[in-house]
A protein has these predicted regions:
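Short Lys/Arg-rich basic patches
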Residues: 1-14
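Short beta-strand-centered segments at strand-helix junctions
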Residues: 13-25
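Short, basic amphipathic alpha-helical segments that act as recognition/interaction helices
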Residues: 35-47
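Short hydrophobic/glycine-rich mini-motifs in sensory/regulatory modules
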Residues: 40, 136-146
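Structured interaction and signal-relay segments at domain junctions
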Residues: 50-52, 58-125
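Juxtadomain coupling helices with adjacent low-complexity linkers
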Residues: 51-63, 93-102, 110, 147-178
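A short beta-strand signature within small-molecule sensing/ligand-binding domains used
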Residues: 125-137
Length: 178
């Protein structure tokens, strides 16, 4: 699957002010949903299969947060779709970071180690770091990720937290396949 690139286009004219257009470029092969509004305007939206699990992912995140006592974030390939243990408006619908995109592409879980200096910041514009993260894979395709966020003064993650996130990613992936 491709990615969405953000571009700025400037149209210059000698006798008129410059026009600046901001556009999102969707990669070739990405599925789109096409809508029309009441005025007949056409709206293109990148299809997110994990978005269909939004309510389910939100419930799963809440149970996981209560069980582990750590903040949980679920993302599709582009945005945060579910949050538990933190204010939702702080993270919901925010764009995932390039470093999280890279992690998803590796298809391997991540666990922050004690004293680690290069921490994984999973969400753009939010100064929080992942303690454990795992990609969600369905039918051989990466469709998102789930993670515990590190909190101030929390103990380092152990095998139990790593296994919880890995199982959660596997379970959400299986739900996507059905």
């Amino acid at each position: 699957m491709g990615h969405i690139s953000h571009v700025t286009i400037v149209q210059e004219a000698k006798q008129h002010p410059d026009k600046v257009f901001h556009a999102n470029v969707i990669s070739d092969g990405d599925p789109l949903e096409i809508y029309t509004d009441n005025d007949g305007e056409v709206i293109f939206k990148k299809y997110s299969p994990i978005g269909e699990l939004g309510a389910f992912a939100s419930q799963y995140a809440e149970v996981l947060q209560k069980t582990a006592g750590r903040a949980v974030v679920v993302c599709d390939r582009d945005h945060v779709i579910a949050v538990a243990g933190l204010p939702k408006k702080e993270l919901l619908e925010r764009r995932v970071s390039p470093s999280l995109e890279d992690l998803m592409e590796t298809r391997h879980p991540y666990a922050m180690t004690e004293g680690e200096t290069a921490r994984l910041q999973p969400v753009e514009g939010v100064d929080r770091y992942a303690a454990v993260a795992a990609p969600i894979v369905a039918s051989g395709d990466v469709c998102g990720s789930i993670m515990f966020l590190a909190g101030e003064g929390e103990s380092p993650v152990g095998d139990a937290e790593i296994k919880l996130i890995t199982v959660a990613a596997g379970f959400l992936g299986k739900q996507m396949e059905e």
